[in-house]
Amino acid sequence: MGDLPPYPERPAQQPPGRRTSQASQRRHSRDQAQALAADPEERQQIPPDAQRNAPGWSQRGSLSQQENLLMPQVFQAEEARLGGMEYPSVNTGFPSEFQPQPYSDESRMQVAELTTSLMLQRLQQGQSSLFQQLDPTFQEPPVNPLGQFNLYQTDQFSEGAQHGPYIRDDPALQFLPSELGFPHYSAQVPEPEPLELAVQNAKAYLLQTSINCDLSLYEHLVNLLTKILNQRPEDPLSVLESLNRTTQWEWFHPKLDTLRDDPEMQPTYKMAEKQKALFTRSGGGTEGEQEMEEEVGETPVPNIMETAFYFEQAGVGLSSDESFRIFLAMKQLVEQQPIHTCRFWGKILGIKRSYLVAEVEFREGEEEAEEEEVEEMTEGGEVMEAHGEEEGEEDEEKAVDIVPKSVWKPPPVIPKEESRSGANKYLYFVCNEPGLPWTRLPHVTPAQIVNARKIKKFFTGYLDTPVVSYPPFPGNEANYLRAQIARISAATQVSPLGFYQFSEEEGDEEEEGGAGRDSYEENPDFEGIPVLELVDSMANWVHHTQHILPQGRCTWVNPLQKTEEEEDLGEEEEKADEGPEEVEQEVGPPLLTPLSEDAEIMHLAPWTTRLSCSLCPQYSVAVVRSNLWPGAYAYASGKKFENIYIGWGHKYSPESFNPALPAPIQQEYPSGPEIMEMSDPTVEEEQALKAAQEQALGATEEEEEGEEEEEGEETDD
């Protein structure tokens, strides 16, 4: 037959992609051939007859000689149909009838007819090897001496063709891998287990870097766990959050070997340290038990948690945590001060800090001692002022030019109300947060109340802050806060009708209109008012705090009425300046006046009532809200009621606030000759004036001499 010819060159028109796919198909055919090769030991166990009939690598040409001669032409026809490639004729040393001929449409039809007839013949004989080729288990293609030169088998690229086993590309490799001593190799890569795959995916997710920095969550967790294992804290879970913050802080602050300042304590931590004292009891053992027994009895500390519960139903009030801390703070206040009654008045909001207000009443005799100390301080100041005035008068006497005294007299100072009466009936303590020290507010004066009505200022939360306003306010923020508390209390402290009543002794001393009554007492026969009646009519609610007059007091005083000392000192002045001393007396509404008599605010009702829950009125509470002072609320349920204020301390005004205008301009000093300006004289006028003065002086001297001579003559006679 001769030597095998060299491999034919590939056609020039074949695209690169086709060459790449064909090369990969050849590599894949080698791998599949190696993977599907049978083990020699297993082949030895099969009987010889079974080995001849079984489909395997040992079988060689199962087609007839005529079929083998026609198969290369079929492959070339299929190759030409798919890719349009034509192969050059190759001289294999066989006769011309066995040489591969160029493929054409006529030859295609002939080959198809011949193949069909051969397949039908084989099917009739029952010896067809077509089913053996379709068998997927280790079927070897037949040996074709002419087809071995066709390196590009088209059946490898068809969709329905089974891949492998294939003829080896290397003619020198004529043995199976198992025959050469290589172990059995499977071409399929084993897939990882689901758990291992999930772990790999989770780790890849944790290794993603953050947007803000180049670190990943995996690295952060490694650093965090390393710190915990190195430090070995007693309770790792409790310090996990702080360690996490420290680890994050170290990302942006590298460790330094120099001295650093200690971190400042956070305000929240400071406040928590101060509030620790509220949750501790002084003493222990039997002493603590005795104190507990004493506290179980009567105590001036109110039940703030019960009040907070009712106001919570009304939709107002503070949180339960803050209410409980306020309760403990007021308990601390009662232990520090001689308090007879105590009540949580409310909370006034501020720009920087807020005020918690406690309304208290001291025991009898305790407040007088403190007032005496305050009076001594004020008297000392007055003495210093008087001494300064005396020194000023002496300086004025020594002065050459005496300034004329002003005729204007300041308006008389209205005295403040005494303790336990009027606007100063109760004492007020304030603090910014529960646990901080309580500060007592001073008594309010009428001038402070009058000026507080003319200004509107936000509170800062610091009592010593000056109040910058016009008209000027006489005091600092502590005095302004006290004045606003007095105004709010007088207008919003209400109670159900019949809860309070006047005593019988005051009934005999009642003045006209009942304006002189300033005290009341609880009615023991009060049974409560149904909730629906409290909501329907405002006449079932009354004011139990005295009204503040325009003068700034609850009880009116005559500002022109003087004491005996003032009358003795100024009798002569009064005679010179006699004027009308009669001033119209101011009268306000009496105590326990119904809310239905309150004046409207620009056609707006001053009060609004509602039920806490309209779906279940039998278990609801009546709630009344002030429209004049937003933030003032009151509730009533049976024999219980309470008032509270939570707001900015400002009165509602339908119009925008306008500050007071400056005072009217005073009259100028009357013009007269003593203040008239004169024109300067000329030189001639000065000389003429001088000559006239000398002449007048000479005339006076002559007259004096003549008078002296006449007197001498009379004496001689």
Curated annotation (Swiss-Prot):
Cellular location(s): Cytoplasm, Cytoskeleton, Flagellum axoneme
Major location (coarse): cytoplasm
Classification via CDD domains: DD_CrRSP4-like
One Gene Ontology CC term in the entry: sperm flagellum
Region (Disordered): 1-65, 503-523, 563-588, 672-717
Record GO biological process: axoneme assembly; cilium movement; manchette disassembly; sperm flagellum assembly
Pfam families (alphabetical): Radial_spoke (PF04712)
Acidic residues composition bias: residue spans: 503-513, 564-585, 700-717
Origin superkingdom: Eukaryota
Entry keyword set: Cell projection, Cilium, Cytoplasm, Cytoskeleton, Flagellum
PTM characteristics: Phosphorylated by PKA. Phosphorylation increases in capacitated sperm.
InterPro entries linked to this entry: Radial_spoke
Assigned protein family: Belongs to the flagellar radial spoke RSP4/6 family.
Function per UniProt: Functions as part of radial spoke complexes in the axoneme of sperm flagella that play an important part in motility. The triple radial spokes (RS1, RS2 and RS3) are required to modulate beating of the sperm flagellum.
Subunit-level organization: Component of the axonemal radial spoke 1 (RS1) and 2 (RS2) complexes, at least composed of spoke head proteins RSPH1, RSPH3, RSPH9 and the cilia-specific component RSPH4A or sperm-specific component RSPH6A, spoke stalk proteins RSPH14, DNAJB13, DYDC1, ROPN1L and NME5, and the RS1 complex-specific anchor protein IQUB. Interacts with RSPH1. Interacts with RSPH3B. Interacts with RSPH4A. Interacts with RSPH9. Interacts with RSPH10B.
Protein name: Radial spoke head protein 6 homolog A
Organism whose genome encodes this protein: Homo sapiens (Human)
Encoding gene (name): RSPH6A
